[in-house]
Amino acid sequence: MLTYNMDVTPESVWKRTTPSEAELAQPYYCTEAGVFYAQQHFSTARTDKESYILFYTLRGAGLIEQGESHVVLSTGQALLLNCRTPQSYCTAPGQDHWHHYWVHLDGAGVAAMEPLLLPGKKLTPVQLTGVKMQEYFEMLLGQMEHSTVDSMVTTGLALHEMLALC
């Protein structure tokens, strides 16, 4: 089940791709990514999706909920979430926006890193400094329009670097 309210401004970007067999064999690959200029009533709730999602907040704050865990993802924070377990996320209460990057990613590399990035399966925001995460997201969004070996490798490396920052 998926329910959502796409309260985002027109400059928001949402890209989707269908990974090839070669991409699915990689340790890291993505199926969707974007940058949302989410407004006050933005929300998503789903029961399951065969992927992980990585968020990175640029401005404002989002509320992420999964099981008994509830975290506010503030400016400069990143969070990995396993979408195979029901979850919801929205613009945080008291906020009028949540400007954030996001990517649905999967692969054996992500699964292997899950115990380190989600200790005890607990939502764990990470405060990041600098602009590296934003650069990786922009690189990723640019590569999604190509279907070459170079773009596949560049995407996988970017996803690996993004997770390493977390």
Which residues does each predicted region cover?
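N-terminal helical cap/lid subdomain that shapes the substrate entry/recognition surface
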Residues: 117-122, 139
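Ligand-binding loop in jelly-roll beta-barrel domains
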Residues: 70, 84-109
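A general structural signal marking secondary-structure boundaries and capping sites
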Residues: 37-40, 61, 83, 144-148, ...
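An amphipathic alpha-helical interaction segment
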Residues: 106-112, 127-166
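Generic protein-terminus/edge-of-domain signal
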Residues: 1-72, 77, 88, 121-124
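Short, charged, solvent-exposed linker or helix-capping segments at domain edges/interfaces
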Residues: 44-45, 112-118
